[in-house]
Amino acid sequence: MILDADYITEDGKPIIRIFKKENGEFKVEYDRNFRPYIYALLRDDSAIDEIKKITAQRHGKVVRIVETEKIQRKFLGRPIEVWKLYLEHPQDVPAIRDKIREHPAVVDIFEYDIPFAKRYLIDKGLTPMEGNEKLTFLAVDIETLYHEGEEFGKGPVIMISYADEEGAKVITWKKIDLPYVEVVSSEREMIKRLIRVIKEKDPDVIITYNGDNFDFPYLLKRAEKLGIKLLLGRDNSEPKMQKMGDSLAVEIKGRIHFDLFPVIRRTINLPTYTLEAVYEAIFGKPKEKVYADEIAKAWETGEGLERVAKYSMEDAKVTYELGREFFPMEAQLARLVGQPVWDVSRSSTGNLVEWFLLRKAYERNELAPNKPDEKEYERRLRESYEGGYVKEPEKGLWEGIVSLDFRSLYPSIIITHNVSPDTLNREGCEEYDVAPKVGHRFCKDFPGFIPSLLGQLLEERQKIKKRMKESKDPVEKKLLDYRQRAIKILANSILPDEWLPIVENEKVRFVKIGDFIDREIEENAERVKRDGETEILEVKDLKALSFNRETKKSELKKVKALIRHRYSGKVYSIKLKSGRRIKITSGHSLFSVKNGKLVKVRGDELKPGDLVVVPGRLKLPESKQVLNLVELLLKLPEEETSNIVMMIPVKGRKNFFKGMLKTLYWIFGEGERPRTAGRYLKHLERLGYVKLKRRGCEVLDWESLKRYRKLYETLIKNLKYNGNSRAYMVEFNSLRDVVSLMPIEELKEWIIGEPRGPKIGTFIDVDDSFAKLLGYYISSGDVEKDRVKFHSKDQNVLEDIAKLAEKLFGKVRRGRGYIEVSGKISHAIFRVLAEGKRIPEFIFTSPMDIKVAFLKGLNGNAEELTFSTKSELLVNQLILLLNSIGVSDIKIEHEKGVYRVYINKKESSNGDIVLDSVESIEVEKYEGYVYDLSVEDNENFLVGFGLLYAHNSYYGYYGYAKARWYCKECAESVTAWGRQYIDLVRRELEARGFKVLYIDTDGLYATIPGVKDWEEVKRRALEFVDYINSKLPGVLELEYEGFYARGFFVTKKKYALIDEEGKIVTRGLEIVRRDWSEIAKETQARVLEAILKHGNVEEAVKIVKDVTEKLTNYEVPPEKLVIYEQITRPINEYKAIGPHVAVAKRLMARGIKVKPGMVIGYIVLRGDGPISKRAISIEEFDPRKHKYDAEYYIENQVLPAVERILKAFGYKREDLRWQKTKQVGLGAWIKVKKS
């Protein structure tokens, strides 16, 4: 049995090593005769002699082709002749391949990126895990004093536990008197003992849970610090760490390091993937969790070490049990795809399919297509296709429900209609299958490459399932089940209204992404490139806010292109705990953190409780801001700027304007040279229009000078002398068409205002006084005809407003509860700058002190900001502004059309990115354009309500953007047929008296109204399955999945059912996070039971009312009110002081150590102020002294847990609360809809 394969180098040549188990013994086989190679397709075979001469350099060594061979292959089913180019060493391939590809005679090169040892297994037809050898297993787990946020490997390893079929043991270096504990003298001796244990037991498989990213990297770090070589390999080598995507992977030579964590993440869907949660989900048994702070306390004090040792032992034991449960399926997958378990267990489904296809392609003499380069990959990512059909659920409580499901719908469609890249639109075929709606044709004259392989897989799976039914041997049954599950794994493998901040010409503005891209594409239609249905507009002067995934720093990056394409399918409406939200397709991703690494997570992969990256601190360009008042006035209608004048003192300018115009006429050859022309020529030179010569001047820009002449002609025509002010005066409206032509140097000399009113300069320096006044206006100001009013009940605030306004505009009027500033200029400034109560764009790029002053005016206190508005735009602007000064602790609430934004403390965030958790996900149907930006380097951008970082992604194998056999037409054809067949089933069902309650892609739920005999419903459903299967083509098959006594459907992906044995099945309704109290979880469970088991909605409502009554009357025991939240970082890094952080701080004040990983349990008390000030630990709670906050638990715990269920029956939140006056509930009129 082959366990693994690699290669080593001797004398510059590669030697393949095959690690095997044979007749119970471990052995290594060597092959010195296998050489690396690539394929090259040439335009002209005569060029092969030139190709042979190509050389490259690798570490000072000359790399060259050592042998060539012309061979016959097929490419996408068509015969092709290619050259096989042999090289001396596997590392020669990346060194020389680009030079070969760049030769003019080379069309392309192929199969140059298949690792050498994997290539060997494929070419030699060797299959890992084949045979009946008995493997030995050992699970390993460690306990450390490391805490998240500390230097990795700084704290010691305090316990190492291991488990095998003989039992579990713990090694430690503190005295613990337990039979399974071995005590050594030091950490160093403990690690050396582990090395001896592994050598003595000599396991074939070492099982860990997150050993790739924690246990082994940590052990390696500690061993290095302690001067030990961690020699665990069968070749006496140390574990080898390597990067694998966003994570690490650890290899132990000669042994299979089987890390359960990636396997379980790929295999089962859970709300959390702690070892305890996984064990309970798989085996149905709870496992105690001992938290990091408890371990640290026990180690420091010596009290409770026995509990920690037991926990460590159970970790190893549980890891061993889980490993034995999951390893057989991974072994079967390894046999199927022909690659070692180490690789298979760390591969995505897409990669598993790829390895399977590569092996089968070699067997069939097919040349594998290349993976896409970055440009092609980006193009594929922009492509989209309509997904499966989803029917909106029928509301209400239903009985007698059958579940029908297509067996392997998409693989069956691929086989039935021969959907494959090599059959797509193939010319000269006698028979084609044409995909509905999309119209792609697939040749039926020969079996396609992928359909034929899928056919074999599904046929094999059906044979196995048949053998499972016939087998009496439980061991054989289990092995067969693992194989059929492995086959199943292999066989199935941003919207217009979102807010987008963009930076253009160093100015920040918010746009709706759809409106913006639509307008840009329509206005620049001649520059738009089309790739299928995708429209791409390349842009130059646009920037987007993004972050660098390596440095985790905010960056302002160029936008390379605006992109849109048609889409019809699912969109995911994602709401975060902070109140942020976004709608994305399953082809777009947000960013999350897994195992300390940033990773992309698609919309269809996210689930409540997941962490999502949002901005903590944003870097915007900052500079001193100056407002041009003339530009503001030009934005107003002409009637609103009537009676506004511009003035300039006469002193020093007598006859200047006439003299300048005469000089300009002379320059243009339309008059004589004025006697005083020199004065005006010097002025024109200062402005950059001319260059003075000994006799006259040289005009540098005739067009600009012509416009300048037009300005002066208009000035002379309209200029008047005002004797009282000894100034020239001109009406602003008379200059509207030309005032923008006035050079800034001249414009600065003018003042502006009403003839008899105060005047101000044409340029306003944005200082902290002006910024604060703007903040006051947005918060409480309004404009009327020719006046601005600021309102406040606080006299101190009014006095501050008055002082700031007088500084800029002169005298103000004080009224009761308001300050009034009269005049058209003040009206114009606030009307234009803050139109619609938005934050002026220049505030975002102002220096920090200006932003802070603005926020103080907006809220009166920038330290603890609270702000309410009905404007989505203003909410987004405010969040961007707060992020730009480093404030990330932001919460958004929305109630009755009003948004409320608040922060707990204005402090700088320590990081440019922070994490927010997903609160809810709604799936909706959408048809129309979806939009995207291509952003330089980072390929992510800030978008959505409340601002999140978004990125593109992919789904499906044919639609998997990195796939070699990528085929967008195949993917959209498969889903089109899928929609057609599920709709056919729906129509046929309804024609036979069934009512379809809900459809999602490949399955549906239905009942027969009026039929009370459930056996008849089942019988008719089974008859229908036989009938429809007789009509379905090919291998398509509808299956009877089960029967449910009762159920209800809230929205898509949210429903609850109960089977005949009383087992409740829910989807999308569960509350499983720690921050739900027991009373909330218990109430939801009782509500589901009342509705599903008893069929009584009114009983469910009564349960809720009873609970709210008990809460109101303080009759709920405190242990049911505890809310648990985990400390995820050092306390001093928290900017938002949530209740768990506040409690943690009080614990620290009492001398209790609080570190990341510690879970804080707290109860919220009655009282005023934020809940962080009213939360106390469960240990502190004394029922004689304390009263919990009943309103908090009703509104934030119990009602949210049940509201999502009962709204399906027409109930609103207010219907569910206990009230002293008895009311009749809606349930009195809701009848169970029986079959």
Swiss-Prot record:
Q: Which segments constitute the DOD-type homing endonuclease domain?
A: 773-887
Modifications the protein undergoes after translation, according to the UniProt entry:
This protein undergoes a protein self splicing that involves a post-translational excision of the intervening region (intein) followed by peptide ligation.
Query: What EC number(s) would the UniProt record show?
Result: 2.7.7.7
Tell me what this protein is called.
DNA polymerase
What the entry lists under Pfam families is as follows:
DNA_pol_B (PF00136), DNA_pol_B_exo1 (PF03104), Intein_splicing (PF14890), PI-TkoII_IV (PF18714)
* The family this protein is said to belong to: Belongs to the DNA polymerase type-B family.
Q: Does the keyword Plastid apply?
A: no
Instruction: Extract the InterPro entries matched here.
Output: DNA-dir_DNA_pol_B, DNA-dir_DNA_pol_B_CS, DNA-dir_DNA_pol_B_exonuc, DNA-dir_DNA_pol_B_multi_dom, DNA/RNA_pol_sf, DNA_pol_B_thumb, DNA_pol_palm_dom_sf, DNA_pol_type-B
Gene Ontology molecular function, alphabetical: DNA binding; DNA-directed DNA polymerase activity; endonuclease activity; nucleotide binding
Keyword field:
Autocatalytic cleavage, DNA replication, DNA-binding, DNA-directed DNA polymerase, Nucleotidyltransferase, Protein splicing, Transferase
Record-level GO BP terms: DNA-templated DNA replication; intein-mediated protein splicing
What's its catalytic activity?
A: DNA(n) + a 2'-deoxyribonucleoside 5'-triphosphate = DNA(n+1) + diphosphate
Q: Could you confirm whether the keyword Translocase appears in this record? A: no
Organism source for this protein?
Pyrococcus horikoshii (strain ATCC 700860 / DSM 12428 / JCM 9974 / NBRC 100139 / OT-3)
